[in-house]
């Protein structure tokens, strides 16, 4: 029989007492009262904060949005099919945040920053809050550098600057996403990080955009955040903030970023769905009262940072779909009032074969020529006014039978100016090529050509300049001004090429 000595027993007990670590952990818990339609009502959670993450027994995460006297309204970040009435819920003490790093470049992720492209996990050692405050007035400086889109109509007449917020607005199927994707393609070699946020889009549309980026080598500097049409409303609501957090990570590291939200009206619809299910009082078009704040707090995060903060920038291009050209609806007017201008795409122009279908008359950039290089200002200064006058004259000319020579010439010039603004999709032009194109049209060199010949001639002219006269491009890129030397060189080349082109066309 084994004998136990009393001193051994007391030593063991003493050791155990010394090892005992008295740790009191207070967990704020509650009970599920009701669950369904992506919403759960919880009893308890007395000390939960607005916007705090809560965790359900089976692992689903939710956000506490409604704090009422006898229950808490939680929106679920998942389907929540396994949540049962009476199961427990605990508050985490955290608010929504995502991991951030350079490794996200070239990846397709969801609103929780989890990869959905099947290429494995993304390593990240830092995290950022999904909702973080926008830079204040002292942290900003005015926009002064151009963000070239590669589209003549925009860069010459509705210029976008780094740190600006420019709305792209129009009916469905008018080429809004094409304008945005062309802008991303044009950032190749410009040291600009791009984020494309797809909210409530068809999976096929997002796949098409990603394929375009991969084929054109744009994925290496682009992050795609996608929440499809079948995603829970909570994730569609969070996706733009996730994209903004990723863009901010680079902006505060003294980098230039551009973010496209496609489109915030789908985010507003998801938020409306959540709000109505939470029984918040509906307002205009059944949207909740704070739908303006939903978009303003997102778009205000776009900024050009001050020199003290490293002069990084975040340019926002939200895309809003209108119904039969009605820009006075609730969400379009909200976003118009928040942004620094809008690019209006017209279904009539699109159907008339003018693509990109930008209505130059009612499109505006509130930053203006501050977002253009000097050379572009010199060449394109009057073209917006000329096109507006031409559109007015064209409408008037439909009723007039006999027009004087000056009016006929003005109409002919306007038609050629409109023709040179046409551009194929995914074919952005460099700023030097745009200057050549606009100068040729604005100075009447295209007047001797038929309208059908304009595009062919301009392609030929740009190709000739690129291969045979690289010095023109060098002058513009080094001085950023349209010097007398550059003008003389260009005049000579245009005259020579027009004569050659007309001879070729005759034979």
UniProtKB/Swiss-Prot annotation:
GO molecular function per UniProt: ADP binding; ATP binding; proton-transporting ATP synthase activity, rotational mechanism
Entry's Gene Ontology cellular component terms: chloroplast thylakoid membrane; proton-transporting ATP synthase complex
E.C. designation(s): 7.1.2.2
Keyword set includes Transcription regulation: no
Pfam name, any one: ATP-synt_ab_C
Keyword Coiled coil attached: no
Catalysed conversion reaction: ATP + H2O + 4 H(+)(in) = ADP + phosphate + 5 H(+)(out)
PROSITE patterns cross-referenced by the UniProt entry: ATPASE_ALPHA_BETA
EC class (word): translocase
Topology relative to the membrane: Peripheral membrane protein
SS bonds (residue pairs): none
Positions annotated to bind ATP: 170-177
Location of this chain's protein in the cell: Plastid, Chloroplast thylakoid membrane
Major subcellular location class: plastid
Site (Required for activity) residue list: 363
Matches recorded under HAMAP family: ATP_synth_alpha_bact
Subunit structure: F-type ATPases have 2 components, CF(1) - the catalytic core - and CF(0) - the membrane proton channel. CF(1) has five subunits: alpha(3), beta(3), gamma(1), delta(1), epsilon(1). CF(0) has four main subunits: a, b, b' and c.
Family: Belongs to the ATPase alpha/beta chains family.
Stated role: Produces ATP from ADP in the presence of a proton gradient across the membrane. The alpha chain is a regulatory subunit.
Protein name: ATP synthase subunit alpha, chloroplastic
Provenance organism: Chloranthus spicatus
Organism ancestry: Eukaryota, Viridiplantae, Streptophyta, Embryophyta, Tracheophyta
Gene name of the record: atpA
């Amino acid at each position: 029989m084994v004998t136990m000595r009393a001193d051994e027993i007391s030593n063991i007990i003493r050791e155990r007492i010394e090892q005992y670590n008295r740790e009191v952990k207070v967990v704020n818990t509650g009970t599920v009262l009701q669950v369904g339609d992506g919403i759960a009502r919880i009893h308890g959670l007395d000390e939960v904060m607005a916007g705090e993450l809560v965790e359900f027994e089976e692992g689903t995460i939710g956000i506490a949005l409604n704090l009422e006297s006898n229950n808490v309204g939680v929106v679920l970040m998942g389907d929540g099919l396994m949540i049962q009435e009476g199961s427990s819920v605990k508050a985490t003490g955290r608010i929504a945040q995502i991991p951030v790093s350079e490794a996200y470049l070239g990846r397709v992720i969801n609103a929780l920053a989890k990869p959905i492209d099947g290429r494995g996990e993304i390593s990240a050692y830092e995290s950022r809050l999904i909702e973080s405050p926008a830079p204040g007035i002292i942290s900003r400086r005015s926009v002064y550098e151009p963000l070239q889109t590669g589209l003549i109509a925009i860069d010459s007449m509705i210029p976008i600057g780094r740190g600006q917020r420019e709305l792209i607005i129009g009916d469905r199927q008018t080429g809004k996403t094409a304008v945005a994707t062309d802008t991303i393609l044009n950032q190749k070699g410009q040291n600009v990080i791009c984020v494309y946020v797809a909210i409530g889009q068809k999976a096929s549309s997002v796949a098409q955009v990603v394929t375009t980026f991969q084929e054109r080598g744009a994925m290496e500097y682009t992050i795609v955040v996608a929440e499809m049409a079948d995603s829970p409303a909570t994730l569609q609501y969070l996706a733009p903030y996730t994209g903004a957090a990723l863009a901010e990570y680079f902006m505060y590291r003294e980098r230039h970023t551009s973010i496209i939200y496609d489109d915030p009206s789908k985010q507003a619809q998801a938020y409306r769905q959540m709000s109505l299910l939470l029984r918040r009082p509906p307002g205009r078009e059944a949207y909740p009262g704070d739908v303006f704040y939903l978009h303003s707090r997102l778009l205000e995060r776009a900024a050009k940072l001050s020199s003290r903060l490293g002069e990084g920038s975040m340019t926002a291009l939200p895309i809003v779909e209108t119904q039969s050209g009605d820009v006075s609806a609730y969400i379009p007017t909200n976003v118009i009032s928040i942004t620094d201008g809008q690019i209006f795409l017209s279904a009539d122009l699109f159907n008339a074969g003018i693509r990109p279908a930008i209505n130059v008359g009612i499109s505006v950039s509130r930053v203006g020529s501050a977002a253009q290089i000097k050379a572009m200002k010199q060449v394109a200064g009057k073209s917006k006014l000329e096109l507006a006058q031409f559109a007015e004259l064209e409408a008037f000319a439909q009723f007039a039978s006999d027009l004087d020579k000056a009016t006929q010439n003005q109409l002919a010039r306007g038609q050629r100016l409109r023709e040179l603004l046409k551009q194929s999709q995914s074919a952005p032009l460099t700023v030097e090529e745009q200057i050549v194109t606009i100068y040729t049209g604005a100075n009447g060199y295209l007047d001797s050509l038929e309208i059908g010949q304009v595009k062919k001639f301009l392609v030929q002219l740009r190709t000739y300049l690129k291969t045979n006269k690289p010095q023109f491009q060098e002058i513009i890129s080094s001085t950023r001004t349209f010097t007398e030397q550059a003008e003389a060189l260009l005049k000579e080349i245009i005259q020579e090429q027009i004569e050659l082109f007309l001879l070729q066309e005759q034979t």
